[in-house]
Amino acid sequence: ILLKESEDGPWSALTLFFRIVYTPAGRGNALFLYENPNVEESLPNVHNVVLHDNEKMARWLAENFIGALPGPFSESPAFKALQYVPLTECYTSGDTSSKYTQTVKAEGIEVDLIWGQLGTPTALELSPEHVGTRSHNLFNLLIESRDASIVVNGRKLPGQVVPRRQADIDTTTGFVYFSEIWIEP
């Protein structure tokens, strides 16, 4: 979920959630949360954090995936200040046809990623020239959300989803990928 307070303004909050089955660094869950992507700081002032159950995998993602993607996640000041915090709970609720929620908890932190007004699932098969890293084939199921939000400790972060063109598809910045597979050709 990528949020802005106005379509032409800066990013106001960003998240990427991963439920990983295989990487060279193992498996696990990781939530990259940029409560304020525009500042190079983290706890205790701002939740620019990575909540994880496998720090080695989370750092591998930051270095080999997030850091390789051009755009807001690697280029935001928050990326340089991320703190890695072990998660204590990670679960989903809702369904993938109307409203879906991913909840991630850590000591003193509770995050709900909420995708509402879900669109029709679209299967994607993308070659490296259409993928952010430019070095992977990508297979996944994209579901657009026209009303997504990020809630941290009961407080909804500012911003809303905005239009986005992704993989030659008009969608929004409130999308969820399922069954995502990255392959180095």
Model regions and ranges:
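Targeting-peptide/extracellular-domain and disordered-appendage signature
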Residues: 1-185
